Amino acid sequence: GFQTLVFTVSVDSIAMMPCNPNIGGSSKGHLVREIDALGGQMGINIDKTFIQSKMLNKSKGPAVHSLRAQADKVNYSMEMRKTLQNTEHLTIRQAEVAEIITVPANSADGETAAVEKKDGQMVEINGELQKITGVKTVSGGVYHCKAVVLCTGTYLRARCLTGEMITYTGPNGLMAANHLTDSLKAHGIEMQRF
């Protein structure tokens, strides 16, 4: 496989589960099976760390039966972290990515640029074809690459509301990613809260 670098604001937040740590069920069970079919680890790790599992909708027909497992959320996170740490060609780095680095494409012929754009190495930013060349961290580190995959979760300019009080933090008191949003907006990507 490709040499891959995973950035995380905290190594302790890898595969951190929410307050209701379920995997599977009626709405998401098919997603777990799709991830499993593609070689993913979600199903494997829940098999190692579940504390209870239940077949839902048993009183209905087999088409709607659905397995849901309740995870030991601490062990699930530790198992997933071990899995990533032992994956060949994968390096984990604890740092906050602040910027996506791009350069103008400057392709001699539009046909080549269109092919590269289709392959994911070019991106149109504010009407101009750009090539992604890397990322820059808050501490100033620059990491060159051929592709960037963003999985921001709930961390971009995260804030927790406790009554009237607003705390600018990620889940469970972890650091929020406060800088990447500006870079994404500068590249013409709209931000929305759901």
Give residue spans per PLM region.
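Generic low-polarity alpha-helical segments
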Residues: 1, 120, 144-148
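Conserved beta-strand-loop-beta-strand element in the redox core of flavoprotein oxidoreductases
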Residues: 101-141
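Short hydrophobic core segments
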Residues: 135, 142-153
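Conserved N-terminal/central alpha/beta ligand/cofactor-binding core
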Residues: 2-103, 111, 139, 151-171, ...
